[in-house]
Structure formats: structure tokens, C-alpha cells
A protein has these predicted regions:
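Helix C-cap/helix->beta junction micro-motif
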Residues: 3-4, 52, 139
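Structural signature of the Rossmann-like NAD(P)-dependent dehydrogenase/reductase core
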Residues: 9-12, 57-58, 95, 119
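Mid/C-terminal beta-alpha module of Rossmann-like enzyme folds, strongest
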Residues: 112-158
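Conserved C-terminal active-site "lid" loop/helix of NAD(P)H-dependent oxidoreductases
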Residues: 127-133, 150-189
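NAD(P)-dependent short-chain dehydrogenase/reductase
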Residues: 47-94, 100-101, 107
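NAD(P)-cofactor binding segment of oxidoreductase domains
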Residues: 1-9
């Protein structure tokens, strides 16, 4: 049988960091402390991939959205257009990631692969409230009264990290990738 140099690429998540109260960006080497099933299974699969000794690339991302499928951006476009008022969490911060930007980075990485765990999201930081405000502004849904609320007021079956900003230094230094600012990418997504 012929040996082949295959690369295993896994797209992972900020959920591997759990609900720890970080106030600095999470680095690729930082220990994961997931609390939910999704985060635990993602971290477990990362560990298994690394333990196999295969040639791997793990890309963690966060707050992923696009013009397709079900996601926060599309939901907020709909809700701000149809609801007179809306409460959105302001005490969880991160960086939205446009799926098209992630796709471009994956292609860049495939062209010059390097083994490792890397983080990718767009640039900047915002809360879910800030993200919603910007979505409504871009699409012109100005009639909805968007109010901020604590995450404790909005029960969720999923435990999200309170501060899920990803440290992207390693991917920048390894692949020389440019990271669009989250608002620029959001405008691009919505204009499509």
C-alpha cells in the first residue's frame, strides 16, 4: 500500500474554554475547561487527533455567521425587522467571524500547511448586544428597541464563555494572514 501525506483539518470552537472569566484573549496553548457537552466533545476530539500523531491542523473559531443557514446574524436581521423590542446579552464578549473569511484562511493554510492549533476570528471585540445593534444599523431596522440584558436574564441550555476573544498571534505569525475588522465583514455579508 502506498503511503500518503494527508493532513487532518478540524474546525473547532471557543467553547473549549468554558465559562472561565478570562479578560485577555485565549491562546491556542491555553488549557481548555469546557462546561457543556459541545465544548467537551470538541476538546476531546482535539486531544484525540493530537494523540494519534497524525499530521493535523486544528482551527478554533468563534461566533461564526454567514448569509446561509441558521445563525445569530440572520436571526437578528429577522427579529429586529419583526419585533418592536428585543433584549440582547451585553455581558458576553467575543469577535464575530464571517464564514467566508474563515474559508479564505482555510485555503491559505492548506496551501502552506503547518502542524498546530490556530485561532481565527475577525478583528475587534464586541458583545452580542453590540453585534445586534450593528446588524440592525446596517440593514436599516431602526424601529426595534434593542435593549441590553445580563446573560442570567436570558437562560440558555448552552454555557458560553463570558469572554471568548481568541488570541490570533500564532496564525498571523505562521501564515501572514490578514484579518478583516468584524464590522467590515458584517457589512460585506449583509450586502450579498
Amino acid at each position: 500500500m502506498k503511503e500518503v501525506d494527508w493532513w487532518l483539518i478540524q474546525i473547532s470552537t471557543d467553547y473549549v474554554f468554558g465559562k472561565e472569566p478570562y479578560n485577555i484573549p485565549c491562546g491556542p496553548a491555553q488549557k481548555g475547561t469546557p462546561t457543556g457537552v459541545y465544548g467537551k466533545t470538541k476538546l476531546h476530539s482535539e486531544q484525540k487527533i493530537i494523540a494519534t500523531g497524525c499530521i493535523y491542523i486544528i482551527i478554533r473559531t468563534a461566533w461564526l455567521y454567514s448569509e446561509f443557514g441558521k445563525n445569530f446574524c440572520k436571526t437578528m436581521i429577522n427579529l429586529t425587522a419583526t419585533k418592536p423590542a428585543l433584549k440582547v446579552v451585553f455581558d458576553q464578549c467575543g469577535t464575530p467571524t464571517y464564514a467566508l473569511d474563515l474559508a479564505h484562511v482555510i485555503i491559505t493554510i492548506i496551501e502552506k500547511p503547518q502542524v498546530g492549533v490556530f485561532h481565527f476570528s475577525n478583528e475587534g471585540v464586541c458583545s452580542w448586544y453590540d453585534f445586534t445593534q450593528m446588524i440592525a444599523k446596517i440593514v436599516g431596522n431602526n424601529d426595534c428597541d434593542i435593549q441590553s440584558c445580563y446573560s442570567s436574564e436570558y437562560p440558555s441550555p448552552v454555557t458560553r464563555p463570558a469572554y471568548s476573544v481568541l488570541d490570533k498571534c500564532t496564525i498571523k505569525e505562521t501564515f501572514y494572514v490578514k484579518f478583516p475588522y468584524w464590522i467590515d465583514s458584517l457589512e460585506k455579508c449583509i450586502s450579498i
